Amino acid sequence: MRRVQLWAIAPTFFLMAAKKALKLAMLLLCLALFAWSTPAQAASQTSPRLEEQVLQIIRKHPEVILESVQAYQQQQQQQVQQAQQAFLQDLKTNTKAVIGESPTTGAIDSKVVLIEFSDFQCPYCAEAHKTLKQLIEKHPGEIALVYKHFPLTPIHPEAMLAAKAAWAASQQGKFWEYEDALFTQQDKLGEDLYQDIAQKLNLDLEKFEDDRILADTAIQEDIQLAESLGLSGTPFFVINGETFSGAVQLSDIENVLASVNKS
């Protein structure tokens, strides 16, 4: 398990922001070059010539690009920090709003709320799932466990489809049973498994199919929340004001729980 400060968890997020800033700076330079040209000159300029002019400006003034990237990074970091602070504050003062319609199990009315950002195709999430089951069984009446979808689709092509199937199951009150089946059979993720689990849970299959189509909005809300917090990997956990990530062990979470209960 890795204990982390929420605002220090996403170097990948800020690297992506830097790349975006660099592209933006290049675009601004190109626009500036066109603005300096007369209409006739702009029309006659060739792409290679424009590229050479841009390169000359960069060679003469590399600090302009660096300053632009740094300014953009700082702006993005400030926005993420503000979102994180607002999230943690809301978790303390308006817990129900943070939970929203997300699946919740355990001691639903507990003051100790463990929010899990997870991906059904993530192997570390599958390991963490086993630990969380042990935690809820060992500490009944102490913790409310909340599931937030964060499918990492660029590296896990089945994650979104699995998330939609689980969301559809939640509309029939079977999220946690469906979630458990997905993680238990993670090596079999695919349409056959989604249908098989639905049948074994005696779901209304017609409603299940309709709800899979409708699942995107709710899942995107979870993804947007995760991205606004600067998260870039799974699993990630927030328990009251404490945060940690990775394939956690039961003793690790219990240590965090003890710390939370003392505060």
Regions found by a protein language model. Name each.
Residues 3-8, 14-26:
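Bacterial N-terminal signal peptides that target proteins for export
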Residues 9, 31, 65:
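Alpha-helical and His/Cys-centered functional microenvironments
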Residues 13-14, 34:
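Aromatic (phenylalanine/tyrosine) cluster motif
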Residues 16-17, 37-40, 250, 254:
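Intrinsically disordered, low-complexity serine/threonine-rich segments
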Residues 25-35:
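Bacterial N-terminal signal peptides
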Residues 40-154, 213-228, 233, 262-263:
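Extracytoplasmic thiol/disulfide redox context detector
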Residues 152-263:
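Cysteine-centric redox/oxidoreductase cores and disulfide-bonded domains
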